[in-house]
Amino acid sequence: MNTIFIAGHARLPSGMAAKNIYETLTITAEIDKKYGVIVAASCTLATQHSQVFVENILRGYSLQDGIETPIKVVKEYYLGKAGNALVSSLKDLYKQYEQHVLLKVHN
């Protein structure tokens, strides 16, 4: 298999539809092992439209280049209540990715 699956989590703000279903926001990403490129992404926002929007924002970025550019794009283009939770989830996802890369280097 040429990809890995990683998830990042963050608390949702109160007053959101997704908060009625989930306590946390989760972003999942399928990532190319060699280049770190996000091949596919999903999140637990309440509407399919918002889920597709987030995937379209994230798809194609390489985590080898860091997480700052995807975070900047989310902040610029996602103007919903979950913006800060999306950023926190992305940071957590990137932390998981870094741990995977470090484990790979040490093994």
Predicted regions and their residues:
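Short, compositionally biased leader-like segments
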Residues: 1-9
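Active-site- and interface-proximal helix/loop "cap" or "latch" segments in soluble metabolic
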Residues: 16-28, 33-107
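Short Pro/Gly-enriched beta-strand edge/turn motifs at strand-loop
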Residues: 8-16
